[in-house]
From Swiss-Prot:
This is CTP synthase. Residues 294-532 form the Glutamine amidotransferase type-1 domain. UTP binds at residues 13, 188-193, 224. The lineage of its organism: Archaea, Methanobacteriati, Methanobacteriota, Methanomada group, Methanobacteria. The active site is at residues 380, 505, 507. Homotetramer.
Amino acid sequence: MSKYIVVTGGVVSSIGKGITSASIGRILRSYGVNVTAIKIDPYLNWDSGTLNPYQHGEVYVTDDGMECDLDLGHYERFLDVELSGKANITTGKVYSSVIEKERKGEYLGSCVQIIPHITDEIKLMIRNVAEKTKAEVVMVEVGGTVGDIESQPFIEAVRQLKNEEGHDNCMFVHVTYVPYLKAAKEFKTKPTQHSTKELRGLGINPDMIVCRSELSLDANLKEKIAHFCDVPIEAVINTPDAHSIYEVPLIMYSANVGSYILNRLNIDTATNKADLYEWSQIVEDLKIETPKVKIAVVGKYIELEDAYISIRESLKHAGAANKVHVDIDWIKADNDFNIDILKQYDGLLIPGGFGERGINGKIEAVKYAIKNNVPIFGICLGLHAMSIAIAQLNGYPDANSTEFDENSTCPVIDMMEEQKKINNMGGTMRLGAYPCKIKEGTLAYEAYKDTNISERHRHRYEVNNEYRDILTSAGAIISGTSPDDFLVEMIELENHPWFLGCQFHPEFKSRPNKAHPLFKSFIKAAKNKKQNQK
């Protein structure tokens, strides 16, 4: 039987509920507990696939092809697990399921209401994940802030969940923010008190309060919060701003979060001590300041780093694996893009994206890397930019993608045939994990040390097979394909120190303890370039 830890948030949004959930999960995993995680997003969208990255950040893709909230990326990286798309519950999914059941007559003529039908569906979705994963503990993060009208059905559902599962099988962790007023030189606990009061007014008494803050809170402040929020002082946990998000599990473990939760939920473990040695080593490796490599991410949505959060984290993982510090600069690939700015970098990365804006800047960045032997890594749209650049530099100046010019006379990149028949936008791309066959003697093979891999995809466009010969005659190496050789999955370039583009998204499979092979190889190449310049 699974036990549930529900994480709610108060005071402000983006407070760190996802990192808190992931950190608690990491701590429990280090005790040998089987943990999974769920993210509840209280928006009416069915999934994250059509959301603006400027507003919502990265769209994370699971193996089973669900477009999800970026917090699932935190869960997978911290817990080192592969989650199902069912781990992302949205209001859209809940209402769609309830309406479908109503149309089928499954409610036997009842007046369908928020309570009990919507709340029952929410609980069913949570329990289905628990049953499928056989997890001992299920982390359930409720998105938004306590008091939001959108979150109310979910708050009511998890309140009911605790009553039905029992006190020993469900607990609540409330994440709040304790602001520091520099003028007064003091912390203010009133927002935390009011947020907890709001939660208790909805029928939920938190078992633990996690206080986010810029600086560390002293014992007197913790005692004050414990007194006014009616929790034991040992259940008031402070997580001040850290050098790295990967430090948070260590901070929480040092505050005895693990033992408190194990006792609160009556969980028996094979050991009384968590094994966080490997995690501690990762944190130390991430603190390395020298040697240093500079990487430019030439992208479209660079104003919000969360739009490329998995790429950022993957670069950090690869830096730790190569014992170097990775300095990341975010370069906007717009019309006024100055190519000379790239001279200072040891490597370039062209991330995925959609639409024409910024594509010319990305193509020019690829050409710069080709002409100057700079290591360059292209992901999804990055592979498209690489293919177009190779063609343009080798006698096909009009090379383009039909994504940007439907009437292109040299469509090196074209929409996949099966995609041309699709009208709906959401959930209709080539999504999820697909196998890839790697050619021996290539950079890809050197990185993976395998000829058969699986990676996650999110795209509608591919290299046009009619232009394969043109690309290979220009020095391109097709180093990865679908098992039937029909789809180009990876491309490299002869006589270049490190030039690799992939149609898939390797950033979704990188872990702090297992840097993705391609990112690891890319950073190694950037490190070599810097060393050879000395």
